[in-house]
């Protein structure tokens, strides 16, 4: 679920960067996505997009699926409930952890995707 994902990001990065900073970053962070990721953070977003696609193949609706999770320290932890919820939660938790580890390059925010994402 998009709202829960936002909170997971805040958990993993200890509130150092707001979730909206990732909405228009690189070629894959935010709606859509194409081309070659511009950096490590953008690769995190592509992996997350691909994970959501896989979840959708199983009949899940990742952007709308509510799941159970906890923030333990700086690690989002999923609480098992069902296959669909667990899958989506795992997608979001992995992405949030990836975001927290990847450098944020301000030059890759709000880029011209038509020219840079081929």
UniProtKB/Swiss-Prot annotation:
Its main location: secreted. Its EC number is 3.1.1.4. It comes from the Eukaryota. Binds 1 Ca(2+) ion. InterPro entries: PLipase_A2 (IPR001211), PLipase_A2_Asp_AS (IPR033112), PLipase_A2_dom (IPR016090), PLipase_A2_dom_sf (IPR036444), PLipase_A2_His_AS (IPR033113). CDD domains: PLA2c (cd00125). Signal peptide: none annotated. It is an enzyme of class 3 (hydrolase). The keyword Secreted applies. Disulfide bonds join 11-71, 27-117, 29-45, 44-98, 51-91, 60-84, 78-89. The keyword Lipid metabolism applies. GO terms for biological process: arachidonate secretion; lipid catabolic process; phospholipid metabolic process. It is found in: Secreted. PLA2 catalyzes the calcium-dependent hydrolysis of the 2-acyl groups in 3-sn-phosphoglycerides. This is Basic phospholipase A2 PA-13. It comes from Pseudechis australis (Mulga snake).
